[in-house]
Structures are given as structure tokens and as C-alpha cells.
Amino acid sequence: MNSLSYLNQSIGFPPPEQALTDPNGLLAIGGDLRPDRLAQAYYQGIFPWFNANDPILWWSPDPRAVFTPSHPFGSKSLIKFLKKSAWRFTINQAFLDVVAGCAGPRNTQDGTWISAEIQMAYYELHLQGHAHSIEVWDGEQLVGGLYGIPVGGIFCGESMFHRQTNASKAAFAILNQHLVKHDFQLIDAQVMNPHLVSLGAKALPRSEFLTILHQYRDRATSASMWNKQEVFIEF
């Protein structure tokens, strides 16, 4: 029977296979959110998820929600919409604003887990070149976006948001296009939910996810792929 691990100042984690089954995937408690610990967590297939004012909780659920990068991504109606849209798309031009957008209130939630502490932790990771954002612009207004952490040839998605219909889906379509161009193998979406299912996510057993992660996590990627840049959607 697996038991919950308590972290100290060391950045080490127990093996993800030791995570609890109830609640599904809870692996460890405690520690901190400094960049080296966060980077090590994603490298091992672990991520933080906890409510504000609660202890830090670390997870590795079974199964794992994943996407295989594909282009073009989205339904026929989304592609038709984007062909007519005047939106602009960028990479890493407004990381903090994207994270703040993801932290905003949602109709389906009473609050958000993306506290000020979380926002600054991922911003530090971004400053070190380990966390990146996709932005969707309507003129000068940020209307949608997403952020996440690449680990070799795997992209670990954290959150997305929209202020106009289809803006988060557009950001995800741009992410897919960008990852396909750079030969990424998998998008980790963490915990399955109805929204992810509607986008085409698949449930992958944790053992299979970890096998793929271990295979591709040390793969070198283009140093310039996450430079600040404007991206043009291709059809």
C-alpha cells in the first residue's frame, strides 16, 4: 500500500508509481516552488496542484490526459472561424499576463488554484527559459492564451484562458502547429476533464506516459523555438 511522502529542502521526489489511488495521483506534500524543484517535478512526470493557503500538493495521476500534437488542429468550424479571424498570435510576449488570465474567475469554478505565489513561481521558471506562453491578440487586447513547460520532446500544458469565444482553442491550435514543426511527441494535459475530452484528449495509463516521457525528456530542441515571436496560423 502506497503512503504519502512529505518533502523537505531536498528537491528529490518519490517515484510517481508510488502515488495514491485515492485521491488519484497524490504523491507528496510540502516542499516549495523554487524553479529547480518545479523543473525536476516535470522531468519526472509530477506537477503541483493545490488551493491557496493549503500545503503544496504534488501529483502524478493514473491515467494521464494527453494529446498527440497535430496540425491542423480543431474542428472544421474552428478552422473556418480562424480563417476569417483577424487575431494575431505570439509566443512569450506576455507570459505574466497569460498566467494572470488563467488565474481569473471562471463560470464553472468558485475560485482559482493559480495564486499569486504560483504566478510568480512560474514567472521565475519562465525567466530561466523553462516555461512559455502562447498569446492571442485582438488588436492590442489579449483575448486568450495558454502556458506550459517543455520537457525535451514533451510539452506539459498548465492552463489556458479566453476572453472571446474560441480564443483558448486558437491558442491550442497554434501550440499544436508549433510543436508539430519542432517534432514534439506529446502534450501532457494532466487530469482528464470534459473540456479536454471535447478537444480530443486521450487517457493514457501512467506507465505508458512515463515510458514516453523517459524516452523523449532529454531530447534537444531548437534553441530559437521559444524566442519571442509572432506566429502565423497555417491551413
Curated annotation (Swiss-Prot):
<comment type="similarity">
    <text>Belongs to the L/F-transferase family.</text>
</comment>
<dbReference type="InterPro" id="IPR042203">
    <property type="entry name" value="Leu/Phe-tRNA_Trfase_C"/>
</dbReference>
<dbReference type="GO" id="GO:0005737">
    <property type="term" value="C:cytoplasm"/>
</dbReference>
<dbReference type="Pfam" id="PF03588">
    <property type="entry name" value="Leu_Phe_trans"/>
</dbReference>
<dbReference type="InterPro" id="IPR042221">
    <property type="entry name" value="Leu/Phe-tRNA_Trfase_N"/>
</dbReference>
<keyword id="KW-0012">Acyltransferase</keyword>
<comment type="function">
    <text>Functions in the N-end rule pathway of protein degradation where it conjugates Leu, Phe and, less efficiently, Met from aminoacyl-tRNAs to the N-termini of proteins containing an N-terminal arginine or lysine.</text>
</comment>
<keyword id="KW-0808">Transferase</keyword>
<dbReference type="GO" id="GO:0008914">
    <property type="term" value="F:leucyl-tRNA--protein transferase activity"/>
</dbReference>
<keyword id="KW-0963">Cytoplasm</keyword>
<dbReference type="InterPro" id="IPR016181">
    <property type="entry name" value="Acyl_CoA_acyltransferase"/>
</dbReference>
<protein>
    <recommendedName>
        <fullName>Leucyl/phenylalanyl-tRNA--protein transferase</fullName>
        <ecNumber>2.3.2.6</ecNumber>
    </recommendedName>
</protein>
<dbReference type="InterPro" id="IPR004616">
    <property type="entry name" value="Leu/Phe-tRNA_Trfase"/>
</dbReference>
<dbReference type="GO" id="GO:0030163">
    <property type="term" value="P:protein catabolic process"/>
</dbReference>
